[in-house]
């Protein structure tokens, strides 16, 4: 409180509590301009006092941002001959007054209005740079509330000095040391970081772009290098596999030439396509049909299947050529290929004798088949197969002949059939059905006639 009483405005009578005349707002603006002009030429001692006053102002401030509006009341320093009576020093001395005064108070509110005057006087020297600085820095440069003890100073004054040198050392450090020393290290650090951000803010996009571009090139180069590192191995492996498969797999011309030679050799040796397929199944376990061999010779199989079948056919040809000198081996191979016997043609007279024997006995015994084969000079197996085929033929013909009898039963009632209607039925045939069955039959034919 002693400090507050020391810097209270003095009236014309020289007392600390005296009430002097109030100054008009226009005169207050002129006084503020004069104070700013003197502040720009102040010495080191004044700067020390300014530090003290600014520090006290920040410590005892109400924490409300104030602008540069014209104050309603401006106390004057026209009295007493103290050290701080009058002049720009008095204005800054008044700034350390009590910060709890109201704007409409004459004495107690002088501290608040003195802060307004101090705000205008302290930053009037940088008023020429406030507009452009605010345009460049923007509201994002305002310090945080905790940077200077909870007080939020105006961003246009201190921040203008951060970008544009003022009268007090120049630059950010000079202005902080001269006019903003009481702001504390927190605000200094915030301003320092904000200044760097303001300087680097336009440059990050190109920097990031260049870095991203270079990093993208490096990353792409790394990927290409990795791909190039992996690709030769994979490519080499694939090429080696491809070369290996190309060496093993024949070309289309080789397959065409082999198919032509195989067909000529097969015909010359007397084997059919079915014989070759069966022989392959007997020799190598892979049974091929006659259609497959035919398609191989006609080059109608797929390239993969042609490549698979060619080695087997080539082995079969080699086996056949090696056994061509010995008829026994050749007959053995031919017998292996010809598992199905040839079709036997029977003469008309022999066929008639077999037919007459079939009418007598459709299913002869083994002894009868042997005697019949000897009498007809046929093989026993031929006679047996003929009787089997004849019985199958009879079965196929009998259902067609018996298919006409059921309609006869539907047309004629059982009672209307005469004694000879049964044909081969014996005399002890069952009697005709009772009238009830006949009535039931008529019930189905004429449902409306019988109730």
Curated annotation (Swiss-Prot):
Residues 1-21, 69-114, 127-154, 186-253, 395-451 are annotated as: Disordered. PROSITE patterns: HOMEOBOX_1, HOMEOBOX_2, POU_1, POU_2, POU_3. It comes from the Eukaryota. It is found in: Nucleus. Residues 190-199 have a biased composition (Basic and acidic residues). Residues 11-20, 76-85, 95-112 have a biased composition (Gly residues). Gene3D superfamilies: Homeodomain-like, lambda repressor-like DNA-binding domains. Residues 247-321 form the POU-specific domain. InterPro entries: HD, Homeobox_CS, Homeodomain-like_sf, Lambda_DNA-bd_dom_sf, POU, POU_dom, POU_domain_TF, TF_POU_3. Residues 220-232 have a biased composition (Low complexity). Residues 339-398 bind DNA. Pfam families: Homeodomain (PF00046), Pou (PF00157). One of its GO terms (molecular function) is sequence-specific DNA binding. SMART domains: HOX (SM00389), POU (SM00352). GO terms for biological process: axon ensheathment; forebrain development; keratinocyte differentiation; myelination in peripheral nervous system; positive regulation of DNA-templated transcription; positive regulation of gene expression; regulation of transcription by RNA polymerase II. Disulfide bonds: none annotated. This is POU domain, class 3, transcription factor 1.
């Amino acid at each position: 409180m002693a400090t507050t009483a020391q810097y209270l405005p003095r009236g014309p009578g020289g007392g600390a509590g005296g009430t002097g005349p109030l100054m008009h707002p226009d005169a207050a603006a002129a006084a503020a301009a004069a104070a700013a002009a003197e502040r720009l030429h102040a010495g080191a001692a004044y700067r020390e006092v300014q530090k003290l006053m600014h520090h006290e102002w920040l410590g005892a401030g109400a924490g409300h941002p104030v602008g540069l509006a014209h104050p309603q009341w401006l106390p004057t320093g026209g009295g007493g001959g103290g050290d701080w009576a009058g002049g720009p020093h008095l204005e800054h001395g008044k700034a350390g007054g009590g910060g709890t005064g109201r704007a409409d108070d004459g004495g107690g509110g002088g501290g608040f209005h003195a802060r307004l005057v101090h705000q205008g006087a302290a930053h009037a020297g940088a008023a020429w740079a406030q507009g452009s600085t605010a345009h460049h820095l923007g509201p994002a440069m305002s310090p945080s509330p905790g940077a200077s003890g909870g007080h939020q100073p105006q961003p246009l004054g201190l921040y203008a000095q951060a970008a544009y040198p003022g009268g007090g050392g120049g630059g950010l450090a000079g202005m902080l040391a001269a006019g903003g020393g009481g702001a504390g290290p927190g605000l200094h650090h915030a301003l320092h970081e904000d200044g760097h951000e303001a300087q680097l803010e336009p440059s990050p996009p190109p920097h990031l772009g260049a870095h991203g571009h270079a990093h993208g090139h490096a990353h792409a180069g790394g990927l290409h290098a990795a791909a190039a590192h992996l690709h030769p191995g994979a490519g080499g492996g694939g090429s080696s596999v491809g070369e290996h498969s190309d060496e093993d797999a024949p070309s289309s011309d080789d397959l065409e030439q082999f198919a032509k030679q195989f067909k000529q050799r097969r015909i010359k040796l007397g084997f059919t396509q079915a014989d070759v397929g069966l022989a392959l199944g007997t020799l190598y376990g892979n049974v091929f049909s006659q259609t497959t061999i035919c398609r191989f010779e006609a080059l109608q199989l797929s390239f993969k299947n042609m490549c698979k079948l060619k080695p087997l056919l080539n082995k079969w040809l080699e086996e056949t050529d090696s056994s061509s000198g010995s008829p026994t081996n050749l007959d053995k191979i031919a017998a292996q290929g010809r598992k199905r016997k040839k079709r036997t043609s029977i003469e008309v007279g022999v066929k008639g004798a077999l037919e007459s024997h079939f009418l007598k006995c459709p299913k002869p015994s083994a002894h009868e088949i042997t005697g019949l084969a000897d009498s007809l000079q046929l093989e026993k197996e031929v006679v047996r197969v003929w009787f089997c085929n004849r019985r199958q033929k009879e079965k196929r013909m009998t259902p067609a002949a018996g298919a006409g009898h059921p309609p006869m039963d539907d047309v004629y009632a059982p009672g209307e059939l005469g004694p000879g209607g049964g044909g081969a039925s014996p005399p002890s045939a069952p009697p005709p059905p009772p009238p009830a069955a006949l009535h039931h039959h008529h019930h189905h034919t004429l449902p409306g006639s019988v109730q």
